[in-house]
């Protein structure tokens, strides 16, 4: 049994350590093992087994498991191994693998059934595709939670300004406690949120807000995630997806309550101790929010988000550029051993309209298609195997390929044959609308012969014919819709030419226009709701069409007018007062725009952004935004001035009511002493003085600062003469009111 048992030193041996100079270990007598250190026992088979005590010097790790039992390492720098020989052997094995990869054909076979969307999901910040500035801004917002969550101090930025202690958060959290990401679906908003949260050291807990509709259950779930300790070692970051699909009284109401409770707790921590009542009622005590919340939505101007947006840091996520998406898809093809041409990848990007998940799914489908075709074509010649053209020979032609074929004529084929072939492809494709839109977008850039503009004038009539046929879908059950397939063939007859040999990669503007139209429609709907709440009478005479074409353009023009050059102060103040009232009527707010960068203080913008609905020319947009910056700053100063005046008037009114209340209480007590009489006249003097201050403040609203200073300097004095004494000459019942008649 002892002879056949393998020695433990032979386990896990590597071929790399089989060479080199090895010294033999000395025997038992040489290393000085005594007979007392040898112990014997009888095994279950009756054999006697001797165990030798391990020497103390061998317990220091000089014997390796990769060596024989009778060998030890050398004590010199080489450790008994020829390092140069090992390096040469590793380089030779690496060259063999490289040559094998070069000589082996690219088959494009898939080794597992894993979805590529999950396989190539970004794991870290550097794996994200596009939107580098936006991603850094989101990472910077999460980084601001480090002092409150991880108890670490952030390094000061060189551009950071000194702020007073009263303006800082006591826990050094960001000003906005919720990060709101919005953008079109399919561009990776949720993936970005997960990656930046994990990159910052948080464990992600995701909730789909549109599915969570039960109020008490959702509230308990959110409170457990944000305020209770979890089994995970990392702090939790709450990610709420599809928040625009939730009802206002459900998920969003809970978030608003959390933010209001956090504001109360922060104010108590800054300005005073909590009340004794709050100590007794611990369940209703305000709680500080110490965990970040990331919300994701598609529609920023949804009605349910109006109450939540003031607490949010809003970041727009845009679709990645075609160049960055092409680089990522090309990398995936290289890693998956797929030989797909760049032109085919560009077609995938156009077909998916910038949707990263859609591109990767289509790429995996094409790879599996190549794999199945290669396996079924094993009996074909080698020249017909493993080519992109042969694998996609029987696949349907995409609509943008048909668009390019419509502008290309083959001089070696009959025109009639080409016409019927293209007609068959258009009818079988099922995307006649996209084909026609692509023809309309591409025909100004193709080569064709024309004297004047006769051909474009002719095609405009056929486009009108297509609109009439398309309307039959709603009027005649689509009976005339089949004639719309002839309109793309008119482009073939009119603009087809043999000089159009290269494909024109069109910019598919349909998706962008649809998203822009949806965003502008949401902005107009939000303004209509504001008008109905603020001015119901005005809302009854205002519709969406008049608001877009008649009201908003003139309102934007008035705000953009350069009234800072007016030297007449009264006229300037009057204009600013009217503009402030207009902003108040439409509930347009002036907010700070920080879209250029997270640490860069941007200019003021109007929320909701009416300039996106009104301004269409990009050059005019830049000019108006540059001119409007000073105007918005002046309007914001005027709004703050009106708020300060209103607070002063409210304070004076409150003091007047308090003094009147005190006066009425003293009248009821019936104090008739001389001291009380004197105090009464003093109180009346103070009351009259406060009344005059209130009247002066109301008169100075809307006037110049100079006139306001002159009015404030005017004072009114009251002289009261009182002769104390008693006389019986005239006796008459005198009431208290008679004294003041």
UniProtKB/Swiss-Prot annotation:
SMART domains in the cross-refs: AAA
Entry similarity comment: Belongs to the activator 1 small subunits family. CTF18 subfamily.
UniProt name for this protein: Chromosome transmission fidelity protein 18
GO cellular component, as recorded: Ctf18 RFC-like complex; mitochondrion; nuclear replication fork; nucleus
Subunit structure: Component of the CTF18-RFC complex, which consists of CTF18, CTF8, DCC1, RFC2, RFC3, RFC4 and RFC5. CTF18 interacts with ECO1.
Sample GO molecular function, one term: DNA binding
Sequence positions that bind ATP: 183-190
Gene (UniProt): CTF18
Principal subcellular localisation of the protein: nucleus
Provenance organism: Saccharomyces cerevisiae (strain ATCC 204508 / S288c)
Gene Ontology biological-process entries: DNA replication initiation; double-strand break repair via homologous recombination; maintenance of DNA trinucleotide repeats; mitotic sister chromatid cohesion; telomere tethering at nuclear periphery
Subcellular location as annotated: Nucleus
Function text: Essential for the fidelity of chromosome transmission. Required for the DNA replication block checkpoint. Component of the RFC-like complex CTF18-RFC which is required for efficient establishment of chromosome cohesion during S-phase and may load or unload POL30/PCNA. During a clamp loading circle, the RFC:clamp complex binds to DNA and the recognition of the double-stranded/single-stranded junction stimulates ATP hydrolysis by RFC. The complex presumably provides bipartite ATP sites in which one subunit supplies a catalytic site for hydrolysis of ATP bound to the neighboring subunit.
Keywords: ATP-binding, Cell cycle, DNA replication, DNA-binding, Nucleotide-binding, Nucleus
The organism's taxonomic lineage, starting at the top: Eukaryota, Fungi, Dikarya, Ascomycota, Saccharomycotina
């Amino acid at each position: 049994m002892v002879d056949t048992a393998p020695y433990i030193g032979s386990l896990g041996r590597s071929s790399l350590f089989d060479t080199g100079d090895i010294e033999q270990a000395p025997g038992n007598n040489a290393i000085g093992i005594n007979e007392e250190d040898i112990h014997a026992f009888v095994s279950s088979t009756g054999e006697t087994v001797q165990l030798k005590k391990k020497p103390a010097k061998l317990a220091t790790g000089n014997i390796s498991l990769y060596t024989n039992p009778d060998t030890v390492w050398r004590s010199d720098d080489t450790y008994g191994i020829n390092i140069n020989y090992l390096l040469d052997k590793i380089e030779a094995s690496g060259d063999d693998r490289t040559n094998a990869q070069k000589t082996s054909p690219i088959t494009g076979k898939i080794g597992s059934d894993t979805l590529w969307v999950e396989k190539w999901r970004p794991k870290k910040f550097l794996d994200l595709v596009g939107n580098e500035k936006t991603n850094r801004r989101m990472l910077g917002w999460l980084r601001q939670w480090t002092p409150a969550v991880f108890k670490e101090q952030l390094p000061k930025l060189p551009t950071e300004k000194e702020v007073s202690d009263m303006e800082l958060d006591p826990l050094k959290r960001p000003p906005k406690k919720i990060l709101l990401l919005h953008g079109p679906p399919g561009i990776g908003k949720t993936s970005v949120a997960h990656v930046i949260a994990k990159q910052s050291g948080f464990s992600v807990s995701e909730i789909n807000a549109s599915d969570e509709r039960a109020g008490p259950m959702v509230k308990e779930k959110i409170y457990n995630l944000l305020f209770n300790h979890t089994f995970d070692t990392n702090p939790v970051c709450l990610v709420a997806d599809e928040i625009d699909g939730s009802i206002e009284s459900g998920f969003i109401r809970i978030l608003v309550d959390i933010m209001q409770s956090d504001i109360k707790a922060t104010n108590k921590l800054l300005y005073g101790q909590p009340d004794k009542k709050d100590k007794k009622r611990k369940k209703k005590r305000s709680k500080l929010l110490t965990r970040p919340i990331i919300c994701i939505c598609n529609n920023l101007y949804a009605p349910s988000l109006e109450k939540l947006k003031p607490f949010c840091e809003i970041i727009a996520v845009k679709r990645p550029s075609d160049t960055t998406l092409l680089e990522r898809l090309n990398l995936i093809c290289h890693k998956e051993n797929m030989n797909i041409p760049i032109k085919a990848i560009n077609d995938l990007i156009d077909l998916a309209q910038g949707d990263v998940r859609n591109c990767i799914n289509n790429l995996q489908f094409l790879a599996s298609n190549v794999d199945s075709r290669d396996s079924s074509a094993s009996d074909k010649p080698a020249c017909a195997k493993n080519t992109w053209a042969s694998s996609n020979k029987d696949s349907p032609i995409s609509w943008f390929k048909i668009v390019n074929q419509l502008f290309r004529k083959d001089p070696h084929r009959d025109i009639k044959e080409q016409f019927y072939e293209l007609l068959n492809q258009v009818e079988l494709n099922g995307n006649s609308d996209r084909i026609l839109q692509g023809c309309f977008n591409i025909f100004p850039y193709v080569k064709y012969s024309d004297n004047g503009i006769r051909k474009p004038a002719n095609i405009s009539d056929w486009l009108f014919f297509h609109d009439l046929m398309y309307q039959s879908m709603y009027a005649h059950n689509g009976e005339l819709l089949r004639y719309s397939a002839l309109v793309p063939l008119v482009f073939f007859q009119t603009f087809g030419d043999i000089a159009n040999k290269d494909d024109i990669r069109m910019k598919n503007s349909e998706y962008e226009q649809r998203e822009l139209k949806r965003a502008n429609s949401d902005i107009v709907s939000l303004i209509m709701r504001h008008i109905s709440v603020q001015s119901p009478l005005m809302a009854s005479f205002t519709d969406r069409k008049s608001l877009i074409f008649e009201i908003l353009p003139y309102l934007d023009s008035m705000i953009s007018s350069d009234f800072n050059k007016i030297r007449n102060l009264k006229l300037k103040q009057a204009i600013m007062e009217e503009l402030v009232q207009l902003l108040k009527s439409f509930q347009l707010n002036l907010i700070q725009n920080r879209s250029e960068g997270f640490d860069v203080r941007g200019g003021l913008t109007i929320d909701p952004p009416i300039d996106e609905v009104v301004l269409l020319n990009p050059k005019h947009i830049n000019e108006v935004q540059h001119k409007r910056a000073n105007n918005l700053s002046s309007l914001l100063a005027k709004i703050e001035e009106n708020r300060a005046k209103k607070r002063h008037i409210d304070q004076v009114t409150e003091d007047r009511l308090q003094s009147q209340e005190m006066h009425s209480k003293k009248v009821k007590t019936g104090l008739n002493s001389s001291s009380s009489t004197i105090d009464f006249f003093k109180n009346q003097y103070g009351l009259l003085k406060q009344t005059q201050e209130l009247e002066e403040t109301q008169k100075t609203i809307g006037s110049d600062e100079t006139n306001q200073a002159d009015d404030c300097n005017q004072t009114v004095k009251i002289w009261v003469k009182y002769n104390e004494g008693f006389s019986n000459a005239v006796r008459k019942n005198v009431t208290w009111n008679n004294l003041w008649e």
